[in-house]
Amino acid sequence: MDYDWLVIGSGFGGSTSALRLAEKGYSVGVLEAGRRFADEDFAESTWQFSRYLWAPILGLRGILRLTPFKDIFIASGAGVGGGSVVYANTHYRAKPEFFENPQWTGLADWEGELDGPYATAERMLGVNMVPFESPGDLLLQDYAASLGKEDTFTRTPVATFFGTPGETVADPYFDGAGPDRTGCTRCGACMVGCRVGAKNTLLKNYLWFAEKAGAEVMADQMVTDIQPLGASDGSDGYTVRTRRPGIFPGRRREITAKGIVVSAGALGTNRLLANCKHSGSLSNISARLGELVRTNSESVLAVTMPDDSLDLWNSVAISSSIHTDQDTHIEVVTYGQKGDAMRYLFTLLTGPGTRWTRVFS
């Protein structure tokens, strides 16, 4: 066997699995379809498509994967570190009513069960509250007051190292065992890729320590198939087939392992397992695969400001929020000064209706 465990995907689930397995002494390989970025490799603006967007068939090998469906457009991460390289650093704990959902409420006391793991994740990811007030926060406060909801205004818990802006210091989180860090400069480009080194991506914590413990992270490895070796239940191990994604078929590999962790995100995991089920490679996969898949219930709305002098970008990606009712949570979001390439994906916000009638509303 090449490894005791192969982890498919290097995002939040994959990085955590890789670290904990490596800490137990297993040999661990991590497969990631995207490339590996150093801080200075990230795009300087969203217009640098080759470093920002993920579409390898077009030669684009950036961090943002856009996946269209009939009624929704999904944004997800690509690259070593998965979603952590492109997300907005925010770390809210689920509200109590989430744990009361009938799909899982009777299975365990989830709020109690997850309290410890929440605390561990917050410590590992360096979660703290945004320590400043930005122009966007003031606008949101005014809007909340106009609705009588000013008491719901709160700053955001984020995985960002603030320190002294632009100043690089020895690791402040793990008694010096982690990488050097640089203080946030409030450029607002967290979701474009943090070129400063202030964003606590998984490369700064879970993956950093997983590699220190011996895990091998292999970038540019798109998994195409998983097959059991010998017994169909996988008790004899697995063969994982990969190829380098790109315009032309890249180098293909076969890697063996005693166990597999599939953690390729909600889209990637379901797509890979469905392909393996339908091809017969993993014929024992449940027919319920893909049911109850959920988004994170967010919609991104664009607002054009008439006055550019407000410097709404001078912040982290998401710095504050309000609740206008029990189910509606509004945040102020920025992509920074050079983050407007996605504006052409937006259109006018209309009321309810059909696909045809809304055009004229």
Placement of each model-derived feature along the sequence:
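A short alpha-helix-loop-beta-strand transition element characteristic
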Residues: R65-I72, G77, V127-P131, K149-F161, ...
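FAD cofactor-binding and catalytic pocket of flavoenzymes
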Residues: G62, P68, G83, Y87, ...
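Glycine-rich loop(s) and the adjacent beta-strand/alpha-helix scaffold that form part
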Residues: E23, G34-D39, E44, V196, ...
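Active-site acidic short loop of glycosyltransferases
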Residues: D2-Y3, A257
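Short, hinge-like loop/turn segments at secondary-structure boundaries
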Residues: T46-F49, P172
